[in-house]
Amino acid sequence: MPGVETIKSSWADEVELDYGGLPPTTETIENGHKYVTEYKYNKDDKKTKVVRTYKISKQVVPKTVAKRRTWTKFGDSKNDKPGPNSQTTMVSEEIIMQFLNSKEDEKANDPLLDPTKNIAKCRICNGEHWSVNCPYKGTAMDTNLMEKKAAAAASAAVDAPKSGKYVPPFLKDSQKGGMGMRGRDDTAAIRISNLSESMTEADLEELVKKIGPQSKMYLARDKNTGLCKGFAYVHFKQRKDAAAAIEILNGHGYDHLILSVEWSKPQNN
């Protein structure tokens, strides 16, 4: 009688005969690794066995994170083990957050600390530099400056009696001259105050030479140090130029200081 030939079956056939369906997922831990075995159907409707290997490592986390991992799961994940389930949970990309304190925010928003902001402003071209250093001096850009000078001279001649302010007698009638006892004409003289100690005669001439011709300039200096005492006198040849100088330079920023320009008061005889 011939012997019966035995045919070896595959593990998939054995699993199908034993369980008649998909076996449950199993997990085993050996030598610092976790092996997860699960069964599923592939595209051809055949049972497949998938084994995933995880390396176990210890990680120091904040207390709040460790406490959150001990929360009881609910819903469809009620019977899942601690940690994310690969079938229901997908880990997205890691986001790194950087926290700034309030002092750094205030420092970043401080406009005075902005290196791109310049405190200087030119009166000729509105650039970020002083008017004395303007590259457009003497060009067509000076047209606006000359118009201001003419308007200031006209307002000084017409509107001065209507302002209601005190006007010195030597300024009430420009046609009478204004010659003092010493023969000096002070009607076209102005006083410039709040000058820096580093001010020189060349700087003073550069400041007023575009306004009109001058007959004399005096920069007050300290006898001991030779530094500027903070004020100067400029005598223009025409009174309208002096009025224009007051209109243009009064309140003008120069060398980090705000200039104060007014009519020069005559000396007492």
UniProtKB/Swiss-Prot annotation:
Enumerate the Gene Ontology biological process terms.
Answer: formation of cytoplasmic translation initiation complex
First-listed, main subcellular location of the protein, grouped into a coarse class: cytoplasm
Identify the SMART domains for this entry. RRM (SM00360)
Give every RRM domain span. 188-266
Task: State the CDD domains in the record.
Answer: eIF3G (cd12933), RRM_eIF3G_like (cd12408)
Q: Which InterPro entries match?
A: eIF3_g, eIF3g_N, eIF3G_RRM, Nucleotide-bd_a/b_plait_sf, RBD_domain_sf, RRM_dom
Q: Name one GO cellular component term.
A: eukaryotic 43S preinitiation complex
Location(s) in or outside the cell: Cytoplasm
UniProt keyword annotations, A-Z:
Cytoplasm, Initiation factor, Protein biosynthesis, RNA-binding
User: From the UniProt record, which GO molecular function terms apply?
Assistant: RNA binding; translation initiation factor activity
Source organism, top-level taxon: Eukaryota
How does this protein assemble?
Component of the eukaryotic translation initiation factor 3 (eIF-3) complex. The eIF-3 complex interacts with pix.
Identify the HAMAP family for this entry: eIF3g (MF_03006)
Give the record's family classification. Answer: Belongs to the eIF-3 subunit G family.
Function recorded in the entry: RNA-binding component of the eukaryotic translation initiation factor 3 (eIF-3) complex, which is involved in protein synthesis of a specialized repertoire of mRNAs and, together with other initiation factors, stimulates binding of mRNA and methionyl-tRNAi to the 40S ribosome. The eIF-3 complex specifically targets and initiates translation of a subset of mRNAs involved in cell proliferation. This subunit can bind 18S rRNA.
The name under which this protein is listed is Eukaryotic translation initiation factor 3 subunit G-1
**Organism encoding this protein:** Drosophila mojavensis (Fruit fly)
